Amino acid sequence: MMLALGAWMGLAATAYSADYTIGISIWDVSNNPSSVPIIAGMNEAAKAAGVKIVVSDPKWDASAQVDNIRDFVTRRVDAIAVFPIDVVGVLPAVHEAEKAGLPVIGALGKIEGIPYVGVDDLEYGRVHARLMLEALKNTKGPKRIGLFRGTAGGSPDRLRMQGMQEVFKASGADIAIESVTADWSPEKALTGFQDLLQRFPNKGDLQLVASMGNCMIPPSIDWAEQNGRDEIIFTTMDLCKSDVDAVQKGTLYGVAFQDVHDMGKLVVDTLVAMNKAGDYHTLPEFARNPPIIVCTKATFDNCKGRGF
């Protein structure tokens, strides 16, 4: 699905100049909470740079994303940014675009062989694991963590998990992880959480529940409160508005997050800078190592970033 000017809540493709056009395929525009601020950030950067962006919505369909990229090739956009659903499945279309002379970058998900704009997901996982260990510092003995995962096989999920496991192993803590494949969906995460509570019905059986991000944790916090399981500690990655409220209330211990609005700006700014430099292989210095921010209730007032 291609989004034209003003087609979706004023956040979709916005034309500012016909001189340079960026085609963008992003996971799911209507059902993925973080897509809204990302697209807003991209529009802001496009307006400032005087370029045009065209946003396509594959709706979490990997084959549709492949079609998006091929359509961009047919339309002869100047560059393509892909927020990948399937980092392997998208490769043939990426290679076709490159053979056609169109530069492609991966955004918030690494695609083999092309530049990547986004946080280091391996380090993102490490940072979150350290936050979880901090949250569990007063918990003695073995620890069981429920973890809401993203899309199986996607590089953000895989690399974040790898980073978490590295930190847990190095800590020497006795930690068991109960993974819930939630596909970045708050609804699927809640269903998985309800299953965890059935499997571990006694207080103390499940010490902490964490999320890979995308606003998956708040419904489970509410469910825990409603069902007398408020002893469970919660942490998450990413920062949506309901996460903000939960941290301030103290029902969410803390958050490790990237500012997704700024990440949207960064994607466009990076391609504009690459075009000006005539080099689509090397990331500009400003696009390397975007910050990962950690906030808890104790530090929240001093934290910078946007909830979505």
Short names for language-model regions:
Residues K52, V87-E123, R130, E134, ...:
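Flexible loop/hinge segments that line or gate small-molecule binding clefts
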Residues A49, V73, M132-K137, L197, ...:
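Short, hydrophobic alpha-helical segments
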Residues G23, V54, P103-I105, G146, ...:
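Structural detector of well-ordered beta-strand residues that form the stable sheet scaffold
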Residues R70-V73, D78-E98, M164, E178, ...:
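Hydrophobic alpha-helical
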Residues A18-Y20, A152, P156, V167-F168, ...:
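Hinge/cleft segment of the Venus flytrap/periplasmic-binding protein
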Residues M1-A12:
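Bacterial N-terminal signal peptides
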Residues S25-A40, V55-A64, D86, G118-H128, ...:
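Hinge/beta->alpha junction and helix N-cap segments in small-molecule ligand-binding domains
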